[in-house]
Amino acid sequence: MRLNTLSPAEGAKHSAKRLGRGIGSGLGKTGGRGHKGQKSRTGGKVRRGFEGGQMPLYRRLPKFGFTSKIAAVTAEIRLNDLTKVDGNIVTLEALKAANVITKDIQFAKVILAGEINNAVTIRGLRVTQGAKAAIEAAGGSVEE
């Protein structure tokens, strides 16, 4: 047996009906589209959300909220990520050099998640109260 000799079982595959090829095919003339109307025409589609001229739902509901652009360039740093930084001084540049955060991140905040055992100095990063307590308990410090 070879791959080029394989074929599906007899009767397993049905050829598709060809539209508009005579009345004997069962799909001649209108080709299964019915008579007249927008959906019978070429390119006859209605756009997403169209409700036949009725005011659509997405316009009936009020607008709300916005997407913060600062959130896109802000990262949360776990305590165990601080150990990946070379040296014991953690800055934004040091985190980028250690590939903890991407190059486009402009702000970072250290959060209380994971564990920290070695003493590190946090410089120029925002720190939550719980994370600050954990860093100081491990013998580290937080500088503004």
Swiss-Prot record:
A family per Pfam: Ribosomal_L27A
Stored PROSITE patterns: RIBOSOMAL_L15 (PS00475)
Family: Belongs to the universal ribosomal protein uL15 family.
Protein function: Binds to the 23S rRNA.
PANTHER family reported in the protein's UniProt record: 50S RIBOSOMAL PROTEIN L15 (PTHR12934), LARGE RIBOSOMAL SUBUNIT PROTEIN UL15M (PTHR12934:SF11)
Quaternary structure and interacting proteins, as annotated: Part of the 50S ribosomal subunit.
Protein name: Large ribosomal subunit protein uL15
Organism encoding this protein: Actinobacillus succinogenes (strain ATCC 55618 / DSM 22257 / CCUG 43843 / 130Z)
Gene giving rise to this polypeptide: rplO
